[in-house]
């Protein structure tokens, strides 16, 4: 009996390694995710459109209007972990007082999409490495811009969404005072709610504490 136990203990790590993909990761699937949420409700992926009144979605990866030129998602949905979603809701409340609102381009991103992006564009300055997984894969990142609530129009920012130009970097100087003000506003409002802007994308905000969450590979169709 002891011999069998020792053999099992020896083989267990080998089984775990075998389950990893070619990038060395074993992203969490639906059943394991459900178990983790039961243990810790903060890990729940929340439907942002249902939680946040007035939130506008423009999920580019559910269309061909993105840097891949392909439709990556089959549904135009936006999810985030519970604390991330609640923080974004507070940002929406703060912006509403200024006559502004949030338009979301992307939020939780299944790991398989990150693999696709990497295969299309290998520069990890702009796309996440599948060897590590992304903040989006953890449900802890939001791609967004600001809109005028009266007109529904986006505020002018330094570049469009998903630009690979240096002009998209938050540190790049901006000559136009209106654009400079808009960029500073979105960064400050999100900072107040616990988000940090990505160093190469003015639209990308990571939630502080994202390291506590695992990489997920769950399709939108599997989520409520």
Description of each model-found segment:
Residues 114:
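Aromatic-lined carbohydrate-binding/catalytic grooves of carbohydrate-active enzymes
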Residues 205:
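Conserved metal-phosphate-binding beta-hairpin within the catalytic cores
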Residues 18-105, 120, 124-200, 209-224:
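Extracytoplasmic cell-surface/polysaccharide-interacting catalytic and binding patches
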Residues 1-22:
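Bacterial Sec-dependent N-terminal signal peptides
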Residues 110:
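Segments that shape or occlude catalytic/ligand-binding pockets
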Residues 117:
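Short active-site loop/helix that positions an aromatic residue
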């Amino acid at each position: 009996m002891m011999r069998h136990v020792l053999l099992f203990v020896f083989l267990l790590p080998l089984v775990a390694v075998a389950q990893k993909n070619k990038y060395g990761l074993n992203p969490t699937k639906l059943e394991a995710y459900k178990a983790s949420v039961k243990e810790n409700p903060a890990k729940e992926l929340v439907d942002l459109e249902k939680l946040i009144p007035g939130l506008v979605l423009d999920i580019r990866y559910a269309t061909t209007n993105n840097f891949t030129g392909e439709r990556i998602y089959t549904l135009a949905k936006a999810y985030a972990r519970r604390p991330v979603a609640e923080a974004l809701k507070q940002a929406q409340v703060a912006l509403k007082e200024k006559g502004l609102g949030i338009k979301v381009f992307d939020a939780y991103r299944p790991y398989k999409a990150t693999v696709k992006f990497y295969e299309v564009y290998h520069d990890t300055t702009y796309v996440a490495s599948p060897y590590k997984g992304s903040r989006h894969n953890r449900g802890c990142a939001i791609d967004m811009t600001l809109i005028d609530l009266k007109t529904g129009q986006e505020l002018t920012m330094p570049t469009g969404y998903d630009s690979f130009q240096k002009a998209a970097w938050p540190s790049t100087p901006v000559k136009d005072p209106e654009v400079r003000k808009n960029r500073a506003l979105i960064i400050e409002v999100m900072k107040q709610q616990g988000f940090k802007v990505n160093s190469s994308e003015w639209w990308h905000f990571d939630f502080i504490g994202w390291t506590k969450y695992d990489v997920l590979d769950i399709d939108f169709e599997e989520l409520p």
